[in-house]
């Protein structure tokens, strides 16, 4: 059986570029077919409504993942309304502001995954250009991957795939990814590696707070420019901590790897030269 997965990307968070790729890292899975629709950087209600309706009415997947910033904003709110009435199981993946509508999403019959270490970018014109945007997202992706947050998202979606394959009702995830949940998912062997990953996660959480201050709470350019610049320096160092954590695990030949089998089963290994089982 091939499970058809629909992914809607409106706007961008750090998880957005990799959420589909994490399900099929070598492009050799035979049990899934992924279809992605998006509205680029925009997440206004009209753009979101267009792609969400197209996913529901034309693609008609077995389940839908909607991913983007701030699930409480007007655009994502429109998507939630459409998805809750579609009859198709759906999950909202978002950043920390989504905590404000966690209960509302549950009442709408939607699943959710809130990623607390996926921070807002420093979106001030004097500071943010395409290069800075790309560097920031590259650092965030490293933090998501190295702390375990990415693995939690991937495994939650894999469980939904398993349910469809087994003919069972999909149990929609209701997950808030905290630092403790993330590092547990990474199965660190070296306690110092775990500590570095925890530090990276916590710094990434604070990056969002600093960027909110710089983007929405500070009006003077001479004040908000260094504020958002400081947030980007923070995420750069969080990414360095993740690299250091992984190097410690490499030194012990204990990096946790969980590749997919072509039939979809999750395999596991730690020693570099052993086969995953």
From Swiss-Prot:
Which chain regions cross the lipid bilayer? none
The ranges of region (Disordered) come to 252-277
- Name one matching Pfam family: MTD
EC number of the protein: 1.5.98.1
InterPro entries noted in UniProt: MTD, MTD_sf
Identify the SUPFAM superfamilies for this entry. Answer: F420-dependent methylenetetrahydromethanopterin dehydrogenase (MTD)
> Keywords of this protein's UniProt record, alphabetized?
Methanogenesis, One-carbon metabolism, Oxidoreductase
Reaction it catalyzes = 5,10-methylenetetrahydromethanopterin + oxidized coenzyme F420-(gamma-L-Glu)(n) + 2 H(+) = 5,10-methenyl-5,6,7,8-tetrahydromethanopterin + reduced coenzyme F420-(gamma-L-Glu)(n)
GO MF annotation list: ferredoxin hydrogenase activity; methylenetetrahydromethanopterin dehydrogenase activity
Pathway per its UniProt entry is: One-carbon metabolism; methanogenesis from CO(2); 5,10-methylene-5,6,7,8-tetrahydromethanopterin from 5,10-methenyl-5,6,7,8-tetrahydromethanopterin (coenzyme F420 route): step 1/1
One GO term of the biological process aspect: one-carbon metabolic process
NCBIfam families attached to this UniProt entry? PRK00994.1 (NF002162)
- Function (record text): Catalyzes the reversible reduction of methenyl-H(4)MPT(+) to methylene-H(4)MPT.
Q: Which family does it belong to?
A: Belongs to the MTD family.
Protein name as annotated: F420-dependent methylenetetrahydromethanopterin dehydrogenase
Q: Which organism is it from?
A: Methanocaldococcus jannaschii (strain ATCC 43067 / DSM 2661 / JAL-1 / JCM 10045 / NBRC 100440) (Methanococcus jannaschii)
User: Taxonomic lineage of this organism?
Assistant: Archaea, Methanobacteriati, Methanobacteriota, Methanomada group, Methanococci
Q: Tell me the gene name.
A: mtd
């Amino acid at each position: 059986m091939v499970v058809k997965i629909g992914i809607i990307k409106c706007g961008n968070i750090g998880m957005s570029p990799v959420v589909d790729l994490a399900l099929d890292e070598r492009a050799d899975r035979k049990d899934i077919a992924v279809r992605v629709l998006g509205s680029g950087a925009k997440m206004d209600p009209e753009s979101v409504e267009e792609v969400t309706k197209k996913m529901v009415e034309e693609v008609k997947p077995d389940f839908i993942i909607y991913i983007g910033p701030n699930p409480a904003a007007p655009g994502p709110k429109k998507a939630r309304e459409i998805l809750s009435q579609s009859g198709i199981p759906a999950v909202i993946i978002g950043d920390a502001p989504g905590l404000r509508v966690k209960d509302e999403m549950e009442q709408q019959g939607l699943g959710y995954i809130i990623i607390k270490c996926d921070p807002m970018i420093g979106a001030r014109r004097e500071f943010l250009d395409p290069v800075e945007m790309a560097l920031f997202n590259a650092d965030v992706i490293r933090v998501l991957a190295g702390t375990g947050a990415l693995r939690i998202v991937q495994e939650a979606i894999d469980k939904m795939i398993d349910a469809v394959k087994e003919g069972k009702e999909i149990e929609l995830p209701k997950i808030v990814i905290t630092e403790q949940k993330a590092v547990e998912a990474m199965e660190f062997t070296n306690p110092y590696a775990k500590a570095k990953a925890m530090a990276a996660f916590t710094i990434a959480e604070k990056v969002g707070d600093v960027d909110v201050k710089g983007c929405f709470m500070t009006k003077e350019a001479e004040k908000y420019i260094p504020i958002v610049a400081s947030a980007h320096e923070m995420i750069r160092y969080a990414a360095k901590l993740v690299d250091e954590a992984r190097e410690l695990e490499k030194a012990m030949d204990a990096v946790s790897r969980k590749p997919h089998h072509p039939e979809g089963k999750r395999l596991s290994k730690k020693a570099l030269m052993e086969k995953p089982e």
